[in-house]
């Protein structure tokens, strides 16, 4: 790690709490965990559980991003846990235009809902990584077992909100077979297709 990076990183850690406010991580994680698991059930993925290490990492990064919008370049890419295992990551940002109308609050499921909307960009018939569906695929990635989220606010005139979620095991492994095994088509859609073919078979035998 270069001396320049160390200085930038230490400066960010020392002063971020002055310029950004970490929001209640217990409430944030309670809400976002429930919404993650709601969507995962729809894709036959097991429920996630909260992880304190991931929560701390996410909260620190959210505070850094809220304080300094170019913190992406300050933090090293490919965040890892204490065992040096790569983590998945989703980031949500919004800026309140009106002072009395915040774009986000800690009881909101908006970050996960916005990430999940990327399902519309994913082609289940050709499984694989695309940048415009990567938030969605991480949410429903079947092998992922843990999540931890953090939210922070830059309390200035614009009120910049940042929400970060980290995941273990990381999703979005660049292998089509991994996507095929981990990103399962919406179970509701599957039931519609099965019911359609069942109806066709019934009609075939009747007539």
Residue ranges and their predicted role:
Residues 13-26, 204-207:
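N-terminal signal peptide
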